[in-house]
Amino acid sequence: MAERCIEILAIPEGKECLILDIGCGSGLSGSVLTDHGYEWIGVDISPSMLEVAKENEVEGDLINLDVGQGFSFRAGSFDYAISVSALQWLCIAEKSKYNVNKRLKNFFVSLYKCLNIGARCAFQFYPANPEQINLITKSALENGFTGGVVVDFPHSTKKKSIIYFYKLDSLKNLLKMLWMLFLKMRLMMMKKMKKLMLLEKEEN
C-alpha cells in the first residue's frame, strides 16, 4: 500500500526529499520509503507501535503525536506526505470531547503549514462509509488543498480508497508559470510579426 502511495505521488527519480509518514505504526511504510532512498519522519498516536518500530530499527525519526490535534513542525518542512490505513481514525470520535470536524481541520490546517511549496500527499485508508470520504475531502478543500479520490478494487469487499492532495498554492504557482510562459510566447510572436512587417515594407 505504501508502494501505491509512492506511485501516486510521482516523485521525480533522484529527487532528494523529506516525507512525512502519518500514522507510521510499526514502521512498515517507512521501511518502503527507506528502500526507495527517501528520508522520512513518522508520527503515530500509539507509543506501543512506535516501540515496535524502534525494535525493528527503522531509519526514520519517530514522534508520538495525535494528528487530530495538529502538527507542530516548522513551516515548509516536508516535500511529500503519505498515510497508510490511518486517516479513517480521524473520522471516529472515540471520546465525547472529540469533535470530528475540528480534528480534521486541525489536521489539514497544520499539515498545510508544514508542507513545502509544490508538496503532494497520498493517503490510503479504508472508509467505513461514503460519508467519511466526503468529510475528509471537504475539510481538505476548505483548508488549502485540491485533489481527488482513487478507489482501488471498487467491487471488492476489501476495497481501499486513496485520496491525493496538492497544496493549492502549488496549483497557483503552476497557473502563474503557465501565464508567464504565455505572455513570453506572445511577446516573441509580436516581435517576430513586427520584424516580418518591416521586411515586407523594405521589399515594397
PLM features: what roles do these ranges have?
Residues 17-71:
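Class I SAM-dependent methyltransferase SAM/SAH-binding core
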Residues 99-117:
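A short glycine-rich, Lys/Arg-flanked "PGG" loop and its adjoining helix->strand segment in the class I
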Residues 118-125:
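Conserved beta-strand signature within the Rossmann-like core of class I S-adenosyl-L-methionine
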Residues 68-81:
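A short acidic, Gly/Pro-enriched loop at the edge of an enzyme's catalytic core
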Residues 1-17, 32:
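Conserved alpha-helix/loop element of class I SAM-dependent methyltransferases that forms part
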Residues 9, 13, 57, 114-117:
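A generic alpha-to-beta junction signature in SAM-dependent methyltransferases
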Residues 83-86:
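A short beta-strand submotif of the Rossmann-like class I SAM-dependent methyltransferase core
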Residues 127-192:
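Class I S-adenosyl-L-methionine
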